[in-house]
UniProtKB/Swiss-Prot annotation:
Organism annotation: Entamoeba histolytica (strain ATCC 30459 / HM-1:IMSS / ABRM)
GO molecular function, one term: calcium ion binding
The entry's keywords: Actin-binding, Calcium, Cell projection, Cytoplasm, Endocytosis, Metal-binding, Phagocytosis, Repeat
Domain EF-hand span(s) in chain numbering: 1-32, 33-68, 72-107, 108-134
GO cellular component: cytoplasm; phagocytic cup; pseudopodium
Protein name: Calcium-binding protein 1
Annotated positions binding Ca(2+) 2: D46, D48, N50, E52, E57
Binding site for Ca(2+) 1: D10, N12, D14, A16, E21
Subunit structure: Homotrimer (via EF-hands 1 and 2); oligomerization is required for its function. Interacts with G-actin in a Ca(2+)-dependent manner. Interacts with F-actin in a Ca(2+)-dependent manner.
Predominant subcellular localization, coarse grouping: cytoplasm
Effect of a null allele: RNAi-mediated knockdown causes a severe reduction in fluid-phase endocytosis and phagocytosis. Also, recruitment of actin to phagocytic cups is impaired.
Biological process according to GO: phagocytosis; positive regulation of macropinocytosis; positive regulation of phagocytosis; regulation of actin filament bundle assembly; regulation of protein kinase activity
Length: 134
């Protein structure tokens, strides 16, 4: 399934997916309308930072979108949340949020995101993140 989706996105068939190919795909699917969010997700998937997503990088990412409705208005935020949730426990810690945004050179965003912790328990659930981000 991941391989078939990769091939669908890789329009020129060169074995790597460029940002433009991803942008065209999500536009066709009417998913992730915010370009800054799409760029952040792309950079997060592109682990080696070469400006393209190879099949291995895509396979690692595929789990975060598997079973998701790509036309869901919140799909970009849900994917971003899963990319930040490094340990996969379904809640974000301050360390996960800070590490993610620091890696992308926008650590000030981490402070804002931590405000999503509505109940003050030190973790951000997906629900809190979506509510805060809307």
């Amino acid at each position: 399934m991941a391989e078939a989706l990769f091939k669908e996105i890789d329009v020129n068939g060169d074995g790597a997916v460029s940002y433009e190919e991803v942008k065209a795909f999500v536009s066709k699917k009417r998913a992730i309308k915010n370009e800054q969010l799409l760029q952040l997700i792309f950079k997060s998937i592109d682990a080696d930072g070469n400006g393209e997503i190879d099949q291995n990088e895509f396979a690692k990412f595929y789990g975060s979108i598997q079973g998701q409705d790509l036309s869901d208005d919140k799909i970009g935020l849900k994917v971003l949340y899963k990319l930040m949730d490094v340990d996969g426990d379904g809640k974000l810690t301050k360390e996960e949020v800070t590490s993610f945004f620091k890696k992308h050179g926008i650590e000030k965003v981490a402070e804002q995101v931590m405000k999503a912790d509505a109940n003050g328990d030190g973790y951000i659930t997906l629900e809190e993140f979506l509510e805060f981000s809307l």
